[in-house]
Every structure is written in structure tokens, then in C-alpha cells.
Curated annotation (Swiss-Prot):
Biased composition (Basic residues): 502-511
Upper taxonomic lineage: Eukaryota, Metazoa, Ecdysozoa, Arthropoda, Hexapoda
Binding site for Mg(2+) 2: 164, 166, 223
Signal peptide start-end: none
Ranges of Acidic residues composition bias in the record: 708-726
Enzyme class: hydrolase
Gene behind this protein: Gen
Protein name, per record: Flap endonuclease GEN
Length: 726
């Protein structure tokens, strides 16, 4: 169990790192912790000797990572722990005897009085397994975690692997928790991982060491006082730790029972209503808040930093003291002595890896693990070869490397695969023939495949340098030999005398021109503009209120020429100077003039062409009119050409010219009645107008007739033709 609530305080300061961080280090392992952890796995069916199986594979993993393990066995349990051991035995053997049995009421020694007889038997099996693997085991005088902490505190090992937080109370400096080599579960890791707790760093950060851990064990609970002090938790203990240093906390706790008068005076002062709870001076808190404090020299309120925080801290400590003194044996000096006591002598540990015993493992451990002999050989043989590679200078050598098969890389470490052989036949007859026959049937290489192992390259270079050098030399690629033969002098003479021999091509190297002779950029850009073809610019279109292509479909936009009806210059000239005389236009020495016409020539021509189409449709057309009539209106427009649209303009209400668009937009009548004017009236282009009247304006005014008079005007008007005379 350990110290209650201790892991919650230390976990924020731990570091999760891979197990290869422990490479080359010596670690002390609480063997009882690993065994209890394996025995508590009851959620699913496991191996009947799960603790042995788990111990074997975990130890193998440490060997592959070049970590030196030191397993510490349990000694004589302290008397303080007898109560805890009895409760554990009751939970372990529950259901064996009825609770109300008369035998239980008799004053007979129970099984719990025998101590750890059954548990020690399990530890003895584990010790036999470890000795067969050549791993060092150490017997502790008392608790295993206490001896592990002792070895770590005196520098004999680099750390402690344990799940019990009691090792911190015993003085452990570096603890490895949650050791895992599995790829499944909550503590899974790809290559093995462990939580590292370094008390040196934790003490420097929060002033939390062994003495405070002992006080926490007395107040919150531990293996020697499971219940602790009722009503005291982690938060109250941490507030007490913040008030006192690591070296003061244990003496302060011992003074709770001895210095009664001192704490009684503190209780009277803390609870005194005549003393201000903020500043600690004489006077009530309410009066100081309103009128101020004369000692603090304030007119309103008082200095809270003098007494308020200190009062709360003292009050919290007095509350813990009051609860702790309810226990008659608090503070228990036996528990404090158990955590602070150490063995008298420091042992001389021989941490060298001893030779593994394959025969002992198969004979003694194989039946406990319920493994067949060939499986035991397959799992244990790599341990023997690794020991021989590391301890190659030993005189007693059992097997020899036969050859190196190939290169390998294991977790980024360069390695080699070897095949070993047994020259003295020590392992002959160790595996039954039946198992060998079954193995050879499944593996084509036969029994020799059991003698294949993978070892690190650096270890092999130290142990067997000649074998490694020969293998690496055999893997080197020889230099490539040129297959081209050198020509002799006679062959060269014959080649020169051949008539068909082609002369050698001489490659001329072009020298780079100096920068002074290089052409400049403006010489490339300075071309003649006279003969250079230039793209004609697009005609500029003027924006107006009525776009040119507003009432025309897309295929008739090209039929209109905007420049032909551009009268902007004429309008500007009239507006800018209305009194100016118009310029006369001559043609072959004669002045041009015109006669007004009643209708638009283009409109008249369109009506005439429309009438001809309705009376006699042309036979030459190749369109199928029946199919065209069935199409929608938009499709029919797209199938007809521009001439058809011009002819059917009146029916489709389309504008054919810009003038017609202007009339349709402003609802100007297309049929204009002939105004009554003098016969000698001439165009505004000439300066012969009578009565100084603008004929163009009169023409426009007369054109604004209602739309409903259009039909009547059509019957009355006659066709007027434009006459242009020389």
C-alpha cells in the first residue's frame, strides 16, 4: 500500500521515459512487489505460475537492455506490520472457514500468526529461477523496499524499481515506477517504459523530502498505521508543509504533545474577539474597518498582512493538532524509527553476472512453468549466448560460435546473426526425440535453427574479433575491373592505315565573350517601328442611355454599324453655337440639298420586303419550316439568319436600326404626317432657311405625335422618295 496520497503529490513531478534510459545502470528490484502484482491479476484466465512467467520475461528484457538487476528478497516482517499481514491473510483465504465457526472463537493461533510462510515459499521459487539465470539476489533484514532504499541511498545501485511508496519514507533517492514491457494495457509502451521519480529534483522544487513523507505517513496512513488520523487529508497536510521547512517539520510535530501551554495560548489568541482578526492588535475587527487602527496608523481599515494569513495558518495547525492528539500513541516513535533506521553495515555486493544454467532451468523450472523441454531451450539459449559474449574471458566455455549468417539491426543497434554449435555435446539428449521430430517437421532448417541468435556488433567485436573481421571482409565488394583492353601499337597503326576510317571530330570550345563586348538590353528593344506590324486598336464605344444592342439578338449585333449613325459632332456643333451658319457641302461644284420625306426609307423597305415574303414564300429555302415552328421562340431565333430577322422585325417587335430603337424606347411614332411648310424649305445644313427657323427642331417636334394616330396617318400619307440632285 505505502503512504496514502503520496503518489498524488509526486506524480506531477515524474518523467515517463523508455527503458533504454536505464542502459548500463544497476537497479534494485523489490521482488515481492512484482510477485504481488502478478498474483493480483484475476480478471481473466492466466498461467498457473504467472508470477514465474512474468519474472522470467521481465528479467530477460532487462538483460537485452544491458541493465544489471539486483533482486531484494523479504526478510523478517516488523512487528508493526503484523496487523496488516493478518488482514491480508484474511482477504486471501476468505471462504475457507465460516466466519461464525466455534473454532474461530477459540484462543488458538491462526494461520496469520505464522507470518509469511506461504509467501516466502513463492519467493523461494522466484529465487531458484533467478539463480538459474545467473542473477544476483540479496536477502534483506526486514522489508524489501527498506533495503532497496538503503542500497540506493548509499550509491550501491542507481535506482529502485518498486510500486510501493514506502521506499520514499525509507530514504530512496531515485524510484522507477510502472515498469512495463507490454504493448497492451494502460501502461503500454512500444519499447518498454517506466516512470522516473528523482527526489533530488523534487526537493529542490517544493522542499519535500523524507521527513515530510514520514509526517504524511503518520497523519494520512501507511502500512504500519493503515487508518492514519481521522479527518486529516492531503490538503491539510500540504498547508502544514508550506509553513515549515523539511528540517523542522518532524520536531514541530513532536512538540504538539509536549508543549501544551504554548498551543493553548495560541488557541486563546486566535479565538479572542477583542483582538482584530486582520492586524492582530487590540480592538474589534468591525471598529477597525470603520474607524481604522491607531497602531496601524490608518483612518479606515487596517493592515491585513500582519495577522490575517498567520492567524489562518495557526488555526489550521491547531485543528490538525487537536485531531492528532485524539490518538493516544501519536506521534508513534516506533514508526518513525522504522523509517529512519538503517543496517549497521554496508554490504559488499558482487553484481557480476554469473553463468546461466540451462540444465537447471529445464529440470527445475520447466515443470513449474509447464513448458516443454524444447520450448525451455528455445527461450533460455539466447540468455546463455549473451552471457558468453559479454564474459568471453571466462575459462569455462560451453558453446562456440560456428559462423556469422548476416547483418541485423535490432531497435537501431547494429547486430549480427550467429549460428552456434555444441562441440562437447553437453546439451545432447536434453530434448526428447519426439519433440525434436515435431520441430523438424515444422522448420525446414531442422534442430540447427535453435542455435541461431542475434548479438550486438560491438560485443562481438570485443569477444570474437577475428570472426567478425573475416565476415566483414567477405562482405566488402571488390573493386570493379575494367574490361576494356589496351590497344597495342600495331593495332593503332592498322587503324590509321584504313581508308574508311573517319576522322576524329574536333570539338571547338567557344570562349565566353567579355562583359565589355556583350550587347545591352536597350539594343534588343530598340527596333524600327515603321515596318513592325501593329494590331489595330478596337474602336472605342461611347456609353449612352440606350445601348446599341439592347433590342437585338446576339447574331444581329454585327449587322449594325455604330459609326454610320454617329451624330455626336453635329449635335455638339449645334448646341455650342446655334447662330453659326452651317457649312455647305459641295459635290462636283454643286451644293447638296434634300427634300423631307414623310417616312423612314429603311422602314418602308422593310414593309415592302415583308409583304413580298407573306405573299409568295420562296421555294429555294432548304429549312424544314414545320420543325422550326415546333421549336421554342429562343431556338427559332437562333436558327434564322440575320436577313430573316430583319424581314420579320415587325412581327417579332425587334428594332432594326439605332433610329428605330430610339423611337421604340421613347414611343415615337414611326409614321410621321407631312408638315405644312414652304416649298423652298431646305435642310439645316444650309444657310438658306427662311425666317431664321431651325428646320431640324421643327421636324423633331412634328414627329412627337400620339401612337394611336399611327394607323390613320398610314392610310393618308403617300410614299415620299429622297431625291438627291447634282
Amino acid at each position: 500500500m505505502g503512504v496514502k496520497e503520496l503518489w498524488g503529490v509526486l506524480t506531477p513531478h515524474c518523467e515517463r521515459k523508455p527503458i533504454n534510459e536505464l542502459r548500463g545502470k544497476k537497479v534494485a528490484i523489490d521482488l515481492a512487489g512484482w510477485v504481488c502484482e502478478s498474483l493480483n491479476v484475476v480478471d481473466y484466465f492466466v498461467h498457473p505460475r504467472h508470477h514465474l512467467k512474468n519474472l522470467f520475461f521481465r528479467t530477460c528484457y532487462l538483460i537485452w537492455e544491458q541493465v544489471t538487476p539486483v533482486f531484494v528478497l523479504e526478510g523478517v516482517a516488523p512487528k508493526l506490520k503484523s496487523q496488516v499481514i493478518a488482514k491480508r491473510n484474511e482477504l486471501q483465504f476468505r471462504g475457507v472457514k465460516p466466519k461464525n465457526s466455534p473454532e474461530c472463537t477459540q484462543s488458538q493461533p491462526s494461520k496469520g500468526d505464522k507470518g509469511r510462510s506461504r509467501f516466502n515459499h513463492v519467493l523461494k521459487q522466484c529465487e531458484t529461477l533467478l539463480l538459474s539465470m545467473g542473477i544476483q539476489c540479496v536477502q534483506g533484514p526486514g522489508e524489501a523496499e527498506a533495503y532497496c532504499a538503503f542500497l540506493n541511498k548509499h550509491g550501491l545501485v542507481d535506482g529502485v524499481i518498486s510500486q510501493d511508496s514506502d521506499c520514499f519514507a525509507y530514504g530512496a533517492v531515485r524510484v522507477y515506477r510502472n515498469f512495463s514491457v507490454s504493448t497492451q494495457g494502460a501502461q503500454a509502451a512500444a519499447g518498454g517504459a517506466v516512470d522516473i521519480y528523482d527526489m533530488r529534483e523534487i526537493t529542490s522544487r517544493m522542499d519535500f523530502g523524507q521527513q515530510k513523507i514520514i509526517v504524511m505517513a503518520l497523519l494520512c496512513g501507511c502500512d504500519y498505521c493503515p487508518d492514519g488520523i481521522g479527518g486529516i487529508g492531503k490538503d491539510g497536510v500540504l498547508k502544514l508543509f508550506n509553513k515549515y521547512k523539511e528540517t523542522e517539520i518532524l520536531d514541530r510535530m513532536r512538540s504538539w504533545r509536549g508543549e501544551t501551554d504554548k498551543y493553548n495560548a495560541l488557541e486563546i489568541r486566535v479565538d479572542d474577539k477583542s483582538i482584530c482578526s486582520n492586524c492582530g492588535h487590540i480592538g474589534k475587527t468591525q471598529s477597525h474597518t470603520k474607524s481604522g487602527c491607531s497602531v496601524c496608523r490608518t483612518h479606515k481599515g487596517c493592515d491585513e498582512s500582519l495577522w490575517k494569513e498567520q492567524r489562518l495558518s495557526i488555526k489550521s495547525e491547531l485543528t490538525l493538532r487537536r485531531k492528532a492528539l485524539l490518538s493516544p500513541d501519536f506521534p508513534n516513535e516506533e514508526i518513525i524509527a522504522e523509517f529512519l533506521s538503517e543496517p549497521d553495515t554496508i554490504p559488499n555486493l558482487n553484481l557480476n553476472w554469473r553463468q546461466p544454467n540451462l540444465v537447471k532451468f529445464i529440470k527445475q523450472i520447466g515443470h513449474l512453468l509447464q513448458w516443454p523441454e524444447i520450448y525451455c531451450f528455445q527461450k533460455f539459449f539466447p540468455i546463455l549466448t549473451r552471457w558468453q559474449v559479454q564474459q568471453s574471458k571466462q575459462e569455462k566455455i560451453l558453446i562456440q560460435p560456428h559462423e556469422i549468417i548476416k547483418k541485423r539491426t535490432v531497435k537501431g543497434v547494429p547486430s549480427l546473426e550467429l549460428r552456434w554449435h555444441d562441440p562437447s555435446g553437453i546439451f545432447k539428449g536434453l530434448i526428447p526425440d519426439k519433440q525434436i521430430a515435431e520441430y523438424e517437421a515444422e522448420h525446414p532448417k531442422g534442430i540447427e535453427e535453435l542455435y541461431y541468435t542475434i548479438e550486438p556488433l560491438d560485443m562481438l567485436e570485443t569477444a570474437y574479433p577475428d570472426l567478425v573481421a573475416a565476415f566483414l571482409k567477405s562482405k566488402e565488394k571488390p573493386a570493379k575491373k575494367t574490361t576494356r583492353k589496351k590497344k597495342t601499337a600495331s593495332e593503332e597503326e592498322n587503324k590509321e592505315n584504313e581508308p574508311n576510317s573517319k576522322p576524329k571530330r574536333v570539338v571547338r570550345k567557344i570562349k565566353a565573350q567579355p562583359e565589355e563586348n556583350q550587347p545591352l538590353l536597350h539594343q534588343f528593344l530598340g527596333r524600327k517601328k515603321e515596318g513592325t506590324p501593329v494590331k489595330a486598336p478596337a474602336p472605342q464605344r461611347q456609353q449612352c442611355s440606350t445601348p446599341i444592342t439592347k433590342f437585338l439578338p446576339s447574331d444581329l449585333e454585327s449587322d449594325c454599324d455604330a459609326e454610320e449613325f454617329d451624330m455626336s459632332d453635329i449635335v455638339k456643333g449645334i448646341i455650342s453655337n446655334p447662330n453659326a451658319k452651317p457649312a455647305l457641302t459641295n459635290h462636283d461644284g454643286h451644293q447638296l440639298h434634300y427634300e423631307p420625306m414623310a417616312e423612314d426609307l429603311s422602314l418602308r423597305l422593310a414593309q415592302m420586303s415583308l409583304g413580298n415574303v407573306n405573299e409568295s414564300p420562296k421555294v429555294e429555302t432548304k429549312r424544314d419550316l414545320s420543325q422550326v415552328d415546333q421549336l421554342p421562340q429562343s431556338k427559332r431565333f437562333s436558327l434564322e439568319d440575320s436577313f430573316d430577322l430583319l424581314v420579320k422585325g415587325d412581327l417579332q417587335k425587334l428594332a432594326r436600326t439605332p433610329v428605330e430603337r430610339f423611337k421604340m424606347q421613347h414611343r415615337i411614332s414611326e409614321k410621321i404626317p407631312t408638315p405644312v411648310k414652304p416649298l423652298d424649305n431646305i435642310s439645316y445644313f444650309f444657310n438658306q432657311s427662311s425666317d431664321n427657323a431651325d428646320v431640324f427642331e421643327e421636324l423633331m417636334n412634328s414627329s412627337l405625335v400620339p401612337q394611336d394616330q399611327e394607323d390613320n396617318a398610314e392610310d393618308e400619307e403617300e410614299d415620299d422618295l429622297v431625291v438627291i440632285s447634282d
